[in-house]
Amino acid sequence: MSTIAVIDYDMGNLHSVCKGLEKAGATPKITDSSIEIDKADAVILPGVGSFDPAVQHLRTRNLEIPIKQVIASGKPFLGICLGLQILFESSEEGQEPGLGIFAGKVCRFKSEPGLTIPQMGWNKLQFTQPEHLLWSEIGSQPWVYFVHSYYVDPTDSQVTAATVTHGHQTVTAAVGKDNLIAVQFHPEKSSTAGLKILSNFVSKVIPKNLALAS
């Protein structure tokens, strides 16, 4: 059974993520310890809230370097919601530099007549990396749950693993590269499709990346 470090930096409720992981057969461990993060089979960086406080909390807990080391080591890593955004270089929402794992920035949805910002509720994913193991056996264009006013805009469009269309704006909803995958939506709130995504991370993504790293 895989042990997954769920990083705690005071940015959101971690327990719903942990429940989803337990249903998928993993053992989640909420932690802000670099030692526990290093020992885990995989790492999840969740998050709800604003960009600047998130990166400030990570840095005051001395978690920036351990996160970068884990990703560089090849260990499976999943970012969720704000945990996706802070992997980028900067955000229109704040002044703090992000972690810079991905080149690009975080942008706010542009206003449109009749468009609600934040996007809050269910929307369809369009896969741009349909062969990614995270999407295995889910079917095309699954409905997943979003709550966000900002989206990531990668410099390299090849890292985009899925998109979502809100109003007339089609934006990145997930990125994937090597051992790193991160999603804007909340799999833990996305019913059957979301639980399957977490299950795929546990049963397919983790074993593959651990095998490659060994």
From Swiss-Prot:
What residue stretch is flagged as signal peptide?
none
Q: Where is the active site?
A: C81, H186, E188
**UniProtKB keywords:** Amino-acid biosynthesis, Cytoplasm, Glutamine amidotransferase, Histidine biosynthesis, Hydrolase, Lyase
GO CC annotation terms, alphabetical:
cytoplasm
Named in its record, the pathway it takes part in is: Amino-acid biosynthesis; L-histidine biosynthesis; L-histidine from 5-phospho-alpha-D-ribose 1-diphosphate: step 5/9
Q: What EC number(s) does this enzyme carry? A: 4.3.2.10, 3.5.1.2
Task: Supply one GO BP term.
Answer: L-histidine biosynthetic process
UniProt entry tagged with the keyword Hydrolase = yes
Q: In this protein, which residues make up the domain named Glutamine amidotransferase type-1? A: 3-211
Q: Which GO terms describe its molecular function?
A: glutaminase activity; imidazoleglycerol-phosphate synthase activity; lyase activity
| Compartment(s) | Cytoplasm
Q: What catalytic reaction does the record list? A: 5-[(5-phospho-1-deoxy-D-ribulos-1-ylimino)methylamino]-1-(5-phospho-beta-D-ribosyl)imidazole-4-carboxamide + L-glutamine = D-erythro-1-(imidazol-4-yl)glycerol 3-phosphate + 5-amino-1-(5-phospho-beta-D-ribosyl)imidazole-4-carboxamide + L-glutamate + H(+); L-glutamine + H2O = L-glutamate + NH4(+)
Q: Which PROSITE patterns match?
A: GATASE_TYPE_1
Q: What is its main location?
A: cytoplasm
On the tree of life, the source organism's domain of life is: Bacteria
Q: Does the keyword Cytoplasm apply?
A: yes
What's its job? IGPS catalyzes the conversion of PRFAR and glutamine to IGP, AICAR and glutamate. The HisH subunit catalyzes the hydrolysis of glutamine to glutamate and ammonia as part of the synthesis of IGP and AICAR. The resulting ammonia molecule is channeled to the active site of HisF.
The annotated subunit structure for this chain is: Heterodimer of HisH and HisF.
The protein's name = Imidazole glycerol phosphate synthase subunit HisH
What gene name is listed for this protein?
hisH
